[in-house]
Regions:
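The conserved cystathionine-beta-synthase
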Residues: 16-34, 41, 81-99, 106, ...
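Residue-level signal for alpha-helical context at structural boundaries
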Residues: 24, 44, 73-74, 109, ...
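N-terminal first-folded block
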Residues: 6-40, 44-46, 54-62
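Tandem CBS (Bateman) regulatory domains
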Residues: 1-12, 51-80, 87-96, 117-141
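A glycine-centered beta-loop-beta connector
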Residues: 30-33, 38-54, 95, 103-118
């Protein structure tokens, strides 16, 4: 299964903010959209990613104000990405080795989607269902 197939199943919605957005405003969007991370994009350039984990570690635990802190101060600027043609195994390997939960999807340096650990798990479950159905059909012949 490819990243493109996963995005076709889940949708290609991408939520982002600019680097001068406050953490509070970014969190507000994350809450409204029920997402665990938001991309930081200036123009069409991916600058970073802000996750709930970043907020907890860099705002809450350091007793900072989310209304007075900009996302570029706490975002993760080293962003690991995948392409539409990458496969599910590549996503799992990258998420596991880098200990991350979200992978922006780029095509020609433009963000076209984002894959979460939840999307990967759902894809694995679907693949297992297909395998079980195939085996059941084979056995019943």
């Amino acid at each position: 299964m490819t990243v493109n197939q996963i995005l076709n199943a889940k949708g290609k919605n991408v939520y982002s903010v600019g680097s001068t957005t406050t953490v509070y405003e970014a969190l507000k969007i994350m809450g409204e959209k029920n997402i665990g991370a938001i991309l930081i994009i200036d123009g069409s350039e991916l600058k970073g990613i802000l996750s709930e984990r970043d907020y907890a570690r860099k705002i809450v635990l350091k007793d900072k104000s989310s209304k007075e802190t900009f996302v570029d101060e706490i975002m993760e600027s080293t962003v690991f990405t995948v392409k539409l043609s990458d496969n599910l195994e590549n996503c799992m390997e990258l998420m596991s080795s880098k200990r991350i939960r979200h992978l922006p999807v780029l095509e020609d340096e433009i963000v076209v989607g984002i894959i979460s650990i939840s999307d990967v798990v759902k894809a694995i479950i679907e693949l297992q269902k297909d395998t079980i159905n195939h085996l059941n059909s084979y056995i019943s012949q």
